[in-house]
Amino acid sequence: MKLHYITTREGLEKAFAELWTIPKLCLDTETTGLDARVNDVRLLQLCSTQADLEERVVYVIDCFKCSDLDGLKSLIESREMILGHNLNFDLQFLLQIGIDYKHKIFDTFIAERCLVAGSKEKKTSPKTEKVFFGEISCSLKAVVERRLDIKISKEQQVSDWSKSELDIEQIEYAARDVDLLPQIAKAQLAELATENLVEVYSLESKVIRPVALMCHHGFNVDITKVKQLKAKKQQELNEATNLFCESLDARLPDGFRLPRHEDGTIAVGKNAKKEFNPGSNIQCIKHFNQIGTDLPVDDRTGKQTLSQVALSEFDSDDLTLNLLRKRTKIETALAHVEKILENINPISGRMHSGYNSYGANSGRFTSSGSKRVTGKKKKETWGINIQQVPRDKEFRECFIPSEGYKFIIADYSQIELRLAAELVNIPQMIDAFNKGLDLHSLTASLIYHVGIDEVKKPQRQMGKTLNFALLYGMGFRKYKTYSAQSGNIITLSEAKTAHAGFHRAYPRLREWHRERSAMVEDGWTYVRTPTGRRRLLSYDDATMSACANTLIQGAGADILKIAIANLGKHINEKFRPIATVHDELVFEALEEKANEYKTILETEMKEAAMTILNNVPVKCDANVAESWAEK
């Protein structure tokens, strides 16, 4: 490797002259932090993508010293291909300095995810020193060691990239990373072809730019409305706390009453010796036992519990316990509001979520919030996960389009059930979808033996819960818990009856579950989606439910990504990607272009689904909106 460290305009122009002759470039960045809206690009590393060069020239551009980067935008944006590792990150930083690369991408991180999805390796816990099987890492360090048998240090990754003079170790570290990429890519390309994963990777690569833009744009937030919501939830929490404490205190025997302030009011706080903390399960369980209230029991430990899951499925008419249940829900909602406020970017004034387009081994997106480094110890933390923002109107109406824009919100209707009907070949479901029947009502009618027009609202809700819970082979005990979490508390006997009735209604589904069970009998299997996406199921992942889930949810991921990839050619300042949540896409469009882009979004999503759904109709609903609540 021959390293050119560039710190002057003269050196930059010479490098540009040489780089313009290279149509395909390896690219990497070193930045002062992980937030592209707050931090800066310190180094930009560029070199040829040719894997067989005897001596590769790596250009390391110091963006702090070369303050005039004129010419960089045209150079990068005109390349035939960019090769990098986890380019979602680098593209966000390039966008921040005005560079929007729109051509072919080869991302060694995404390629590795395609190749090793679900694969595991022996690892040792640093705390307990126990050996376990964990996910194979796709970090550059791990990929280099696995593919090239070269061990590299990443110590410099967390060094100070903002200081005026960089160490030679930092510069060499930056150059070395980009120098290894062509060899990795060569090995991956060969394996992608051998494993019939070229088309899957091609799809994944087309999603990278739209996802980087999604992270870059973020959600516009009505801060005033969020603060009003926080005040409202705080008031509700105070009232719920008072009602719960008063109810509990009134039932406690003399000598066990809740602690008091000098004025006689109940002392509520986190000082366990002097105050009562209604958020402390230990304190609450003790007092509930003193008043003789039955509490849920954790099946794993055999001990009483007040966890949200346990409370949600515990049938009780105890007033005090139900007041605690209500208080817990409000406290959780308040925590969500506070997290929204904490994660509004100080530079953009927007909320930027981080997306991993291959976050789940099934191929589905994951959102983990914006990644950032805080504190003297350079601790990595994550911001809000946009997928966890409550669906309630009062939350979603806080997310609004930019001035002069409208939201276009589109999602697939019952896409997992439609995919199951198609891929599993469930005749009753295929017939229902083609006739435009409500599948949840159909399920209820088959279980309760009534006409579909006679199904009552609670029965339809039961049908809906069954459809989503039992699709992947959930047992009746887990179904009881799932039903309670959906707001319908049932007995174990009722869960067992409904479970059996569902499988009588859809015998092909039960047969498919048996087929999936047989696939994992040996403790491992490969599952492929209709597009060829592959996932290895092994060790504790080799279950029937995971085998079923991977086919359906993996196909759903394929459909959504085909839509995003095809929408890439339409993306510009008039039409911008904002978010993806499960099967939903949110875009911003200029007001005068909103209806035009609504049609484009709806059409692309329908056509994407039709690549897999041949016997079942696609239903995709899109609408123009003033807030995220207007879905």
Stretches found by the model and what they are:
Residues 25-27, 105-106, 278, 407-411:
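Short hydrophobic beta-strand that contains or immediately precedes a catalytic carboxylate
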Residues 1-29, 37:
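N-terminal accessory regions of nucleic-acid-interacting proteins
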